[in-house]
Amino acid sequence: MEFNELMNAFAAKCGLAGVEAEDGCVVLEFNDIPVAFMENDAFESLVLRAVIGAPPPETDGSLAKAMLRANHALCNACGATLCQDPETKEYAAVLTIPLSIADADLLAKAVGNIVKTVNTWQGVVASGTADQSADSRLYV
């Protein structure tokens, strides 16, 4: 399915009027979380990106370590990859879906997963630390 066709089918599923991509990107908000939907022509895929937030200045490195653990087998991130933007230093959740298998239903599930991941990790980032004892709450 083409990017614009997919985004309009997803918008209809969400009860929205058609959406217009700007520079290959559409931003929609779910539960107060903006999710960017970006077309990646090089890999014929759709990339979803949602910002988790900036780490507190006094972070001791435990957040980054916890995110690396969460990325292991994607078990603590609902299939998303947790990362840090090198320019803004903000943490984000990123999920890639091949356009060849994407449809409105799959996109709805992906959005649910990325929103759940961001909600969970916003709490962890706000606390400023994620030690081993916190791991059980990180499973989303």
For each feature predicted by the language model, list its residue ranges.
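Short, highly charged C-terminal tails/helix-capping segments
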Residues: 126-140
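A short local loop/turn or secondary-structure capping micro-motif enriched for an aromatic residue
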Residues: 45-46, 56-57, 100-103
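A short acidic-to-branched-hydrophobic micro-motif
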Residues: 37-39, 44-54
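Ampiphathic alpha-helical segments that act as solvent-exposed interaction surfaces
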Residues: 66-67, 71, 97-129
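Charge-rich, low-complexity N-terminal segments
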Residues: 1-36, 75-77, 83
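Structural motif
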Residues: 22, 40-42, 87
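Hydrophobic residues embedded in beta-strands of well-ordered beta-sheets
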Residues: 26, 44-46, 89-91
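Short, internal acidic amphipathic alpha-helical interface segments
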Residues: 51-90, 94-96, 139
